[in-house]
Amino acid sequence: MSVDATAPTSAATPPPPAPPEFPTLLGHPRPLWMLFMTEFWERFAFYGIRWALVLYIVAQFFNGDATGQAPAGRTYGAYLALVYAAAIFGGYVADRVLGYQRSILVGAAVMATGLFLIAIPDHTMFEIGLATVVVGNGLFKPNISTMVGKLYSVADPRRDSGFTIFYMGINLGAMISPVLTQLLAEKVFGTDAMPSYKMVFMASGVGMLISLVWFWIGRAQLKGIGAPAPNAQGIGRVLMVLVGCVLAIPVVYFLLAVGADVLQIVLTVLFVGLSVMLLVEGIREGKVQRDKVIAMLIIFAFNVLFWMFFEQAGSSFTFLADNIVDRGFGDWTFPTAWFQSVNSIAIITLAPVIAWIWVKAGRFNPSIPRKFGLGLLFNGLAFLLLMFALSSLVNDAGKVPFWTLFMVYVIQSVGELCLSPIGLSMVTKLAPVRLVGFGMGGWFLSTGIGNNLSGIFAGHVSGSEGMSVSSALSGYTFGFWALLGAGAVLFLIAPLINKLMHGVK
């Protein structure tokens, strides 16, 4: 690809240093597997509470009344949004203050604290616990993803498959966690009618502590990657960041308390500000880097739409499963929580298949924008199936067949495989070298905006009196048309985005 020689280009910025030579395991740097297990346990903790949050809010704070479904969905969306929005600050702390390794360790410790606080059955402590998890995850999540990218050179052909393996760690934790925590909550310490949600939160806290210890023991494998600069290795900066976390928790608590609509304004302002910072840095580095940043920001916008509808999985789909899906198999009832594992099982099963398809496609392998477009379209197909089930398959008891929601999760998973692993790798290739952490933060912030919108949308699906067949059908019909339109537009503008990416694959 020719470059305008009359203008400064990204070549003016020194390329990132080559990673050290690592011993390999199964063809990849050995530290990848340490990061894999660290992320596995963090996702175990995260997804352990995911299935329980909206059900717990309705049961604990609304005495089980269906009118609590809409507020629960909005709280869930706001919490997820803030989890991902906090990544932009975590990226900054790692880039400029603490280094990636110590950011991960501090974040894990703060997250574990928040998970144990959630177990206290008080509304204020519940939201303080959520706020603490948000702050800790902001330090942890973007930086462990960035560490994966730092194990490979930009041109390393193993890079994308390395991110896919890392993504498998995410999904293994997410698969096991709902099953195990549901058994603890309903079979060991509670009943189907009265689950012990406290045990869900406690088990998740223990999982987070395991993640912390695993990374602490294994970080020597990284050979200095992500370590703080020589002038930033003292304990003083760690204490400064811990004080910052303590000060940030009340701010996040306030944002949870003000509601999803106000939060949406805050998140939008943050996204615009971050986009400007990335664009200014891209312009400073030259025309090629500027174009790459523009391409990345366009894809971020479509990422918002994907997650707005995908994250119904943890909110409105949970109420759908609990109230409108026929989960009975003779004398046994399929637990609502276990639907959260379907996505992860599908990811683990289908990820090698999707990867094989991309390899075999050769020159017909879709570009990054078209893969994102496919992700949107598959997400839309899932909503089309829901439309069909709610309009044509409702039985006399007002229930839809089990297989319909099961397949919705599977189809959404195919869409996720087209989009999310590619997105993580894309950011490390397109973001300005000096602001890769901010680039990851932008990816997670766009996901967070989508998550907050998902909570608002879930509230509309549930309605003021709780979810009904008619309210679900109306909401999911809108979801189908929105996703179909977004996917079609992205396919149409894909050639323009490819041009802006200057050969990045």
Protein language model annotation of sequence segments:
Residues 158-186, 200-211, 245, 340-347, ...:
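Glycine-rich segments within core transmembrane alpha-helices of 12-TM secondary carriers
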Residues 73-94, 141, 175-177, 341-354, ...:
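Central cavity-lining transmembrane alpha-helices of secondary-active solute carriers
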Residues 40, 114, 125-140, 300, ...:
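Hydrophobic core of transmembrane alpha-helices in multi-pass small-molecule transporters
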Residues 106-127, 377-397:
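C-terminal ends and interior cores of transmembrane alpha-helices
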Residues 1-28, 154, 185-318, 323-328, ...:
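Intracellular loop-helix junctions on the cytosolic face of multi-pass helical membrane proteins
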Residues 103-104, 372:
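Primarily marks hydrophobic transmembrane alpha-helices of the MFS/SLC 12-helix fold
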Residues 268-278, 332-362, 375-383:
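Transmembrane alpha-helices of Major Facilitator/SLC transporters
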Residues 51-73, 186, 313-337:
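Short amphipathic helix-loop junctions that connect adjacent transmembrane helices
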